[in-house]
Amino acid sequence: MTRIVVTAEIRPSEDEDKVKVAVANFFSFKSSKVEEGKYRLFVAESDTLSSLSKFHRVLREERILDAARKYLRRGIEGDRLTFMIHKQAAYVGKITFVDSENESPLGPITYTVFHRDLEAVVDWLAPRTSRGRPLWDNPMPED
């Protein structure tokens, strides 16, 4: 079963709608909510890998498949894949991976993907390349 959860803090100085746009630029969510806490937290969810199709497309447009593959593979732990991108870059339609929350001053956008075959998910999102070109284009794994 596939489950994708994307979270982003909404800091007091931020416009909630802009945070939602930053998330929606790369993730087509099925449901969303705002949770209250130290910071408000925007939580978006989906139950299908097709919700990552925009992310898949932009990785190719920006020609960052090698870097993406490295970050994605590093984020696999058991049945989950976790990675973070820079929220302000996402708002303007750019993917910038971050290693820690400190690299994104207003907090990162955190993706958590649950799927039975995370290696296949990584191979679909960011296949191996040669001289910057994908060696193959894998189909999206089944949910």
Swiss-Prot record:
Family: Belongs to the UPF0201 family.
Disulfide bonds: none
Source species of the chain: Metallosphaera sedula (strain ATCC 51363 / DSM 5348 / JCM 9185 / NBRC 15509 / TH2)
One Pfam family from the record: RNA_binding
Protein name (Swiss-Prot/TrEMBL): UPF0201 protein Msed_1787
